[in-house]
Amino acid sequence: MIIEKKIKNYTVFVKKDGEKYIEIFKDFLSYNHQVIKVFRNIEDTKVVLINTDYGKYILKVFSPKVKNTERFFKSLVKGDYYEKLFHQTDRVRREGFAALNDFYLLAEIKTLRYVKTYVMIIEYIEGIELVDMPEISDEVRGKIKQSIYSLHQHGMVSGDPHKGNFILQGNEIRIIDLSGKRPSRQRKAKDRIDLERHYGIKNNVRDIGFYLLIYKKKLRNFLRRIKGKEKR
C-alpha cells in the first residue's frame, strides 16, 4: 500500500510503514545527510549514495531543464512517469518478484500534473555490476534472461538492459534503473533484442511486437536515407 502526504512544498509518496524514509527525506531537506559516494553530478541530475541511521540508500534528485513546455503538455496527457514507476515497482515486488531494486520514496514539487523537481530514495544494492566483470558466464546469462522474462510476466520492462543496469548480488541477478513506461509488445521485444545485442542471448520470440519494431526501424532508416542521413 502506498501513502501520499504533503511535506513542505513536496507531494510525497511512500510505502505504508515507511516512516524511516520520511525521516531520511526530512534530513535531506535540512541538509543533514552524509554522502558516501557521488555517482552523478550534472546540472539537472544528482545521484549519490548516502549513509543513514537505517543503512545505505541511493538518493536521486532530478530537476529537468530542457523541453519544459513539451513535458508540461505530455504530463497532462500521460501523467507522471516516476509516479507510475513507483507504483509499478511496489506492485511487482508485492507479487513476489524481488529482482528489481526497491523504490522507497518519491517526492515531487509539481503544478497540476507537471513535476519540476523529483527526489527519490532507492534501494542500494551491494554487488558487482556486470560492466565490471571481465567475462559473463553462461550461468549468469541464463539468470539475466530469466530476470527479464519474469519482469515481462509481471507487466514491466527494463527499457535499457545494458551491463550497467544489472548487478550480481551473491548468486542472484538484480535489475536497476527500470522503465516506468507501459509494457507494450514492442518494448518487450526491444528488451529481448537488446539482450541478444549486449550478451548474445538469442531472441527466440518472434511475435507481433518483434515484427512491428523491426519494420518501424526499417521505415525510419528508409526515411533517413531519403534525407541523406546515415541509418541507425
UniProtKB/Swiss-Prot annotation:
It comes from the Bacteria. Disruption phenotype: Insertion mutant shows reduced intestinal colonization of 3-week-old chicks. Pathway: Bacterial outer membrane biogenesis; LPS core biosynthesis. Keywords: ATP-binding, Kinase, Lipopolysaccharide biosynthesis, Nucleotide-binding, Transferase. It catalyses: alpha-D-Glc-(1->3)-[L-alpha-D-Hep-(1->7)]-L-alpha-D-Hep-(1->3)-4-O-PO3(2-)-L-alpha-D-Hep-(1->5)-[alpha-Kdo-(2->4)]-alpha-Kdo-(2->6)-lipid A + ATP = alpha-D-Glc-(1->3)-[L-alpha-D-Hep-(1->7)]-4-O-PO3(2-)-L-alpha-D-Hep-(1->3)-4-O-PO3(2-)-L-alpha-D-Hep-(1->5)-[alpha-Kdo-(2->4)]-alpha-Kdo-(2->6)-lipid A + ADP + H(+). InterPro entries: Kinase-like_dom_sf (IPR011009), LipoPS_heptP_kinase (IPR009330). GO terms for molecular function: ATP binding; kinase activity. GO terms for biological process: lipopolysaccharide core region biosynthetic process. Its EC number is 2.7.1.-. Belongs to the protein kinase superfamily. RfaY/WaaY family. Kinase involved in the biosynthesis of the core oligosaccharide region of lipopolysaccharide (LPS). Catalyzes the phosphorylation of the second heptose unit (HepII) of the inner core. This is Lipopolysaccharide core heptose(II) kinase WaaY. The gene is waaY.
